[in-house]
Amino acid sequence: MCGIAGIILFDNKKVNREKLIEATDVLKHRGPDAGDVYIDNESIPRVGLGHRRLAIIDLSESANQPMTNENKDVWIVFNGEIYNFQNLRAQLGHGHSFVSNSDTEVIVHLYEQYGEDAISMLDGMFAFAIYDKKTHKIIIARDRTGKKPVYYYKDSHKLIFGSEIKAVLKFLERHEIIMNEHAIPSYLVYGYTMPAQTFYKGIYRLDPAHYMVNKQNGSLVIKEYWSLKSRINDVSPNPVHASKDDPMLRLKLADAVKKRLISDVPLGAFLSGGVDSSIVTGIMSKFMNEPVKTFSIGFSEDPDYDETAYAHIVAKRFLTDHHSFVVTPSAIDLIDKLLYHYDEPFGDASAIPTYIVSQLARRYVTVALNGDGGDELFAGYQRFIAGSMSESMPGLLRGMFYDFSFLIPEQKRERAIPSRIKRFLKELKYPFIQRYLDWISYIRLDAINTFVKPELLYRDYKEEIISYFDSHIKGIEHASPLTQLLYINFKTYLPDDLLIKMDRMAMANSLESRSPFLDTGLIEYAFTLPDKLKLNFIKTKYVLKHTFKDILPRQIQHRRKMGFGVPLAAWFRGRLKDYAAGYLNSNTSEIYNYLNREAVNRLYEEHQKGMADHGLKLWLILTLELWLRTFKKGSEI
């Protein structure tokens, strides 16, 4: 893992070396081992590339970046890992001269030989920029699922890119740094911005499975190089692999884990005690010659959020070298640090334990495998149960159940079963997509106008959000409702929340995180499996649990899914109570330039009185307030 940054100037201005170094070094947490820059101020456009290195493969200085070929006419800055780099190197024809054993250098020569087609040949997680001096092109690419981030800013004079927004901001003048107020509604609904936008006007995320080509004249083209939709459309209606014990699944996941054990530094695994991380740990233990170092985290004050007992069961089963940590409410002291690493407000409070478990792991290893992606591929979330169940109901029955929802009283805890049933029933009156959107929302789409000031709600904002999600179904209308929901989740929540969180929190601690479940071959295979093998009535991840039943301890196979959350309900009635009040009830609160004070105060009071659990909503609003204060000061986020 590393950090990349760069600037391309289309006019006669030259790249400022000091500013390029500053933009690169602001990413030092992503790459503490080495850093350097490359500048070409002789050509048009002018090009500056910066790199911070976290050494994982080939620890020698010869693998440092920016890196070039033997002719010095192809340059690269690269963040990530390419798992098939040794095979690709062997496939390259004669005439290539290597100075290192790194995967980065293979990309350089692969581009020399295949041009843009080289991108689709890469198996791994990556974000990189290539400067082709012969054609004066800049190519910036991102991996298929979005494990590695790329942000960019472009106007008529320049193109700027970076692994994090903070690197992009270093190149901008203060008058160019403008808040994107239109990001607030989608943030309040889902906890992240979309599509591809950020809280800064003009700064965007490059979509996963896409690359951009910037030509000498400044024209920019963005292309998609991989599409999961085409795989979904190739699925046979009567697949031959319809067994709950699936040897092909076993083979593909084992291969995905094995290739992610390539490393010249110590590695381990995050172990929550859930199905996915337990399977990954079990497979690792078969391939490694020493005990797997595993890391888990829990919450002492709320058993609903504490999985450490399950993690210990798995650790004992595989004789791992296990380390655990208990999070206390004092973890809120990390909020400012997390905001710095996110560069934006963040709605997913599980960033806190993710940061802490990454910090714990980094004491012992430089690489950690995780279970991310298992829920996304094999229908592990309750939203998939709700979606499939509701779509199978006749319309009249949905209407009856919707009326019944008003008989269920509000609960003090969001995770309480009556709360979940009430939420499920309340959304039954809506069309399929909006039903799903409201189930995954923090604040329901229809309730946003209660919180956000009218002048901020641009016309058709609601339709725009719905149509964005709806657009993901175009081309796979024939697929089952479950497949459609899995695909939407794969294209939105996975890259825009889950993977951003894992990247930021791991890299904040100079830790590389690898996700075997997000292996391309496994993803494509999983989407060919019939629904009944993923969701068997209300049994989630059905085929996964059965295929690996010999690995999974019985207690893990049949345990209730807890999720990697934070006890916000208790925190906002305890340690966070006065902290939140100090920011949200102040005369200097920034959020009330955008939100209605009365609506926010009502949330806070209802939560404190135990009338409802608004912990998730309060976290969303609190982090927005903290970010706004920092932004208004003009200091770096």
Summary of predicted features, one role per range:
Residues 302, 326, 345-348, 412, ...:
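Alpha-helix capping and helix-loop boundary segments enriched in small/acidic/polar residues
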Residues 18, 179, 244, 248, ...:
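Generic recognition of stable, solvent-exposed alpha-helical segments in well-folded globular domains
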Residues 37, 149-152, 279-282, 377, ...:
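Generic hydrophobic alpha-helical membrane-span motif
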Residues 1-342, 354, 358, 550, ...:
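Cysteine-centered catalytic environments shared across enzyme families
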Residues 129, 347-358, 397-403, 586, ...:
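Short, basic, helix/turn surface patches
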Residues 297, 344, 388-392:
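Short beta-alpha connecting loops at secondary-structure transitions
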Residues 1-4, 22, 117, 176, ...:
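Adenosyl-5′-phosphate
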Residues 144, 356-420, 493, 498-522:
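Active-site adenylate/phosphate-handling loop in enzymes that bind or generate adenylated species
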